[in-house]
Amino acid sequence: MIVVKRNGLKVEYNPEKINKFLEFVCDGLDASMSDIAMNSDLLIYDGITTDNINKALRDSAESLISENNPDYAIVAGRILMSDLRKKAYGDFTPDSFLSIIKENTYLGMYTEDLLANYTEEEIEYLDTLIDHDLDFNFSISGALEWEKKYLVQNRVTGTYFETPQISYMCVAMMYFLNEDKLYSKEERLQYVAKAYKYLSEGVWNIPTPHLARLRTPTRAFSSCVVIKTGDSIDSISAVDMAARRYATLGAGLGIHTGDLRGKLSPIRNGAAINTGALYHAQSIERAALSCSQGGFRKGSITFHWHGLHKDFLDTVSYKNSARPDADSMKHSDHAIWINGFILHKIRKNEDIYLFDPPEVPKLWKLFYSSKLSEFAKEYNRCVADPKINKVAVPSSRYIELLVAERIGTGRVYIGFADTLNEKSTYNEDKYPIFSSNLCMEIALPTADLEFKYDSTTEKYDVDGLIALCNLGGINWGAVSNPNEFYDIADVMMNAIDNLLSYQEHPFGAAKRHNSLFRPIGLGITGFAYWLAKNNLNYNNNYELTDYWMQTYSHAVIKASIELAKKRGPCEGWLDTKWAEGVLPLDIRKPALESIISHKEYYDWDEIRNEVKKYGVRNASMIALFPAETSAKISGSGTTNGIEPVRALIQSKGGKETVAKFTVPELIRLKDKYDIVWDWKNNEGYIKTVAVLQKYTDQAISANTYTNRKNFSNDKVPVTSIINELYLAYAYGLKTLYYNNNQDTMDTSLYNGDAQTKAEVVEPVASEEEEHCESCSL
C-alpha cells in the first residue's frame, strides 16, 4: 500500500511508524494503541496522504472517548498538535524562538514591535522558559480551536507560522511591550515570565482578539463594543459605519436602539411619517453581517430595546422564526430592558403603557436610572396627559409575550435598567448606562454617536461615547488557594492596562471612552469544575463562593489602585462612585442577606481610603462573561464561565471545531458534577449568580435553563419564569442572557461502551460560539 507524503513523495506504508507514533501520543495516558490502530485500519487506503492518516488516527481516537475512557480526548489532541508542528516548522522539533519571531516579522505575520522592544538576548532567555511539551496537554476540542482560530496562519494557503507555546510567549511579551519604561528590564522579564506561566498552565483565559491578534500588525483587541443610537439619520449613519468597522476587527456588538422613534411617528412636524425602528436596525444589522469578525466569522450583534417603547409588541418578536424575513431580524439577538416599576405592574396585573420616545424625553431619561419613585411619578403624568400618545397593553399579555419569545428562541435577553445604574460604579446623572454588549456582561456608559468634522485631519470622525471592554479570565479550577488571586490579578491587570494604551482606535468616541474610564472586565472560568472539586453544587456553595469572590474583588481592586499610584488614575474617575469611596459590595441588594449573611473578610476601609486618595486606574474591573471557547484551551480543558455542565461529555464547537469535550477529572469527579438537566428550577443558580454579582461592578452573562420534563404535560407555566424574573431582580442581577431549553437538545451521556452519543448542544447553544467571537473568548 502506497502513502503520499506532504512533499509529494510516494513511499510504502509502514505500520511500524504508526505504532511508534501511537506509542508517543498514548504515553502516560489510559489509552489503547491497538484499539486506535484497529479503528483506523478501516479508514486507511492505498494512495492515502500522511495528512489523511493523521486524520484517520485522530478520528479513531475521538470515537473511543467515553466516560470510562476520557483520555482519548488528549490522544486525539496530541495527534492534531503533532500534525500542526510539522505544518508550522516542517519538522516535529520547533525552531528557536528568535528565528520564529524574525521569520514571521519578515513575512509580515508578526508586528515589528517585538524585535524593536526586546533584545535578542532577552528573547533567547524567554526561549528557555517555553515548555513545548505543554502543547500535548490539549484535548481535541482545544486543539481544534488552536488550529482553526488562534494560531497565526494564512487562511488562504493553509500555512501555519507558530504553535501554541510560541503564541503564548509572544502574547506575554506584547502585554508588557513598554513595561521597561516603568520598571527595570529584569522586572519586565519577570512579568513576561509570569504571564507565560499563567497562560500556558491554563490559569488565565484571554479572549480571541488577544490570543489570535496580539503579536500581529493589527492593533485592535477589544472584545466588546457597546454603541448607542440617537434618534436622527446622522446618528443612525454613524452607528452603521461604526458597526461595520468593529465587525471587521473581531468585536462583538451591543447596539442600543431603544431611543429610535416608533412606527408611523411624525417626522419634521408631520411632513413625513417614520417607517419605524426596524428598518434602521436592519440596516445596521446588514452592515455588520456583511463583514467578517477578523476573518473568523460574520459580525454579530445584540440589539437593545426599551421595554416601554410603543413598538414593543413587534420588537419582542424580531427573532421569531415565524415572522416574514422582511419584517424580522433573525440573524441578530435582542435584549428587552425593563425595570422594577414594570415588574410591579405585572405583579399587580395592571395595564402597561407604551410610548414614543420623542414624546416622553424625561420618562426615557429616568428609565435609565435608579430613581424609581421619580420614574413612577413621570410615568403616571404621561399616562394622564391626553396630548401624549400611548398604547395600553395588559400586563399579562406583555409578560407572556416576553417569556414566550425568551423560551421559544432562547435568544431574547432581559436587562434591568434601574439595577444596571443603581449598582454601577459610575455617577448615573453624568454617565448613565443604557444597555449592555453582545453577551450581556458589560455595563459601561455610552452616548449617542454623531458625525463630527475634524479640522486638524480634515476628515469626519464619530463623536459621542463608544464603550470598549478588554476581557480576561481566571480559571478558578486551576487555583488551589484564593490568596493566589493577588499575584494573578496583579499581572493580568498590568497586562490588560498596558494593552489599553497600545491598541489603536478607529474613532475618537472610543478613544475618549478609553481615556476616561480604561475599563477592564476580569471574569471567571472553570466555576462548575471548582464546585465539583469542593464537593459543592449550585444550591449549597454560597459561603465558599462569597469568600472566594470577595477575595477576588479585593485582589483586583488593589491591583487597580496600585496601577493608579504608578501611572495615575483614569481621567474620569472623579465622576465615579470610587471617588466617594463607594465599592461594589457597598451597593449590594438587601435581599442577599436571605442567601448569606454579609461578612467582610478584609479591611475594606483601608481600600476605601486608598481609593479616595489615589483613585483607580480602571473605572470598571470585573465582568463575568461566557468563556465558551477559551475554556477548552485551559490546559486539557475546563468548564466555561460560571455555567453548569449539561453533560459529562458533550459535542462542542463552531462549524469547523465541533469535537467531543469531557469535563475535567471526569473519572474522579464524575459523581460530583452538578448536571443542569437534573435541576428542578433555576433558583439555586440565580442565588449563586447573585453572590457573584455582589462583588461584580459590571454584569454577568447569566443563563437560565428550562426543562419541560419538570412540568405537567411538558408545558412550562409562565408563572414559573416570572417568579425567576422577580428573584433575579430582587437579588440584584443586572442581566439575563440565554434561556437554554432541554427539549431542543440531545443530552445523552456517554457510558462505558462508548456507543451512546455525546450531548449535541442545541443550535442556540452551538451558535453561542459562532455568534460570540469576543466574550466567548
Q: Predicted segment positions?
A:
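Internal maturation/activation junctions in enzymes
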Residues: T216, A489-K511, L536-A627, I700-S701
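Catalytic alpha/beta core of large soluble enzyme barrels
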Residues: E122-W146, C439-K452, I496, L500-S501, ...
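Alpha-helix capping and helix-loop boundary segments enriched in small/acidic/polar residues
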Residues: R6-Y13, T159-E162, Y183-Q190, H210-T216, ...
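Terminal amphipathic helices with adjacent charged low-complexity linkers/tails
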Residues: Y72-N104, I338-N339, L420-A443, D448-E450, ...
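Conserved catalytic alpha/beta cores of large enzymes that bind or transform nucleotide phosphates
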Residues: A272-Q282, L289-S396, E400, A404, ...
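Short acidic, low-complexity intrinsically disordered linear motifs used
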Residues: P763-L777
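Function-dense linear segments that define catalytic or interfacial modules
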Residues: V152, I166-R188, V192-N269, I273, ...
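Core nucleic-acid recognition elements
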Residues: L9, A31-M173, E186-Y196
